[in-house]
């Protein structure tokens, strides 16, 4: 008889090194086949039957997302929902499904294509929570790296799916937060400084020499540095793109202020990120590159605003790592 395992994240008081454990509830599949998601014997959907607090998300909606991901697109080992929706260390500032999907082999689809798949399968108009912030990582990477991002997801996250062949285990010991803090702080100090220096050079080129080409190029490059800094401080690894449009799409839910600064609402018509991308491509080599000073000034001001937002975000995250290191 096929069975389902429903996972519930509960406090564990008997082991100080393992604050969480997974409670397994075995349910006869014949008694639970009214939900289409439960048709697959490999799926384990978190329906937490014993959670007293009000949920911040709809389990049926989470199950629908998992079903879409596993319906011929991916063969994951497991999928975790982490962050504030499950009462864990906050990740996204916006209300979003922070999901970590771990796969054994590099999949055909990357996170950008997967967002499109989910948009087709679970349209925004049908979602109670609009945003899905999905990370796709290989099992080999997860098993060979210790970062705060991976620790928070695995220690606090809710297991939405686990393959029949994989035995999911939570970390028994915390990572070395002192090392994580030092590493993130070094990256923050190095690349934030470079970003700020580029902003100063951009302002000098704009105000003093009236060189719009250099002002545009330096502003765009500064934004790339700031986004790389933000990604590393939160995730403990380098981001694999220098495209400011892609970088914002990857990190936008980390701060609603960033979303307000750069998201195009089709009312305000905020095109700063595509313009920054074009600055990077055209200002170094395009002989006909030109931009009106008034328009460039608007884009530069948004970059300065984003720099302050990112610096504040990184500062708060670094404080968290430092506080956790002092408790060890």
Protein language model regions, located:
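Short, hydrophobic-rich beta-strand element in sensory/regulatory alpha-beta domains
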Residues: 77-81
């Amino acid at each position: 008889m096929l069975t389902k395992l429903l996972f519930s994240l509960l406090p564990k008081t008997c082991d100080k090194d393992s604050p969480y454990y997974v409670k397994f509830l075995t349910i006869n599949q014949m008694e639970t086949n009214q939900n289409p998601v439960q048709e697959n014997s490999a799926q384990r959907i978190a329906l937490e039957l014993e959670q007293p607090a009000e949920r911040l998300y709809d389990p049926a909606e989470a199950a629908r997302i998992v079903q879409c991901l596993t319906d011929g697109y991916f063969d994951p080992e497991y999928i975790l929902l982490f962050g504030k929706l499950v009462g864990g260390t906050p990740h996204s500032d916006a209300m979003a499904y922070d999901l970590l999907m771990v796969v054994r082999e590099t999949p055909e689809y990357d996170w950008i294509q997967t967002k499109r798949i989910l948009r087709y399968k679970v349209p925004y108009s049908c979602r109670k929570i609009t945003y899905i912030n999905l990370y796709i990582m290989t099992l080999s990477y997860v098993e060979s790296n210790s970062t705060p991002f991976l620790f928070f997801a695995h220690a606090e996250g809710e297991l939405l799916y686990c393959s029949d062949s994989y035995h999911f285990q939570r970390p028994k010991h915390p990572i070395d937060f002192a090392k994580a803090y030092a590493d993130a702080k070094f990256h923050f100090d190095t690349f934030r400084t470079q970003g700020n220096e580029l902003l100063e050079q951009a302002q000098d080129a704009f105000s003093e020499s009236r060189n719009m080409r250099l002002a545009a190029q330096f502003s765009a490059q500064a934004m790339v540095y700031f986004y790389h800094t933000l990604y590393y401080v939160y995730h403990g690894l380098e981001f694999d793109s220098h495209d400011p449009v892609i970088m914002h799409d990857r990190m936008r839910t980390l701060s609603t202020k960033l979303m307000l600064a750069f998201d195009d609402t089709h009312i305000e018509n905020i095109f700063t990120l595509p313009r920054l991308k074009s600055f990077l491509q055209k200002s170094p080599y395009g002989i006909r590159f030109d931009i009106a000073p008034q328009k460039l000034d608007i884009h530069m001001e948004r970059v300065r605003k984003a720099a302050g937002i990112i610096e504040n975000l990184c500062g708060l995250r670094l404080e968290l790592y430092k506080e956790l290191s002092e408790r060890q």
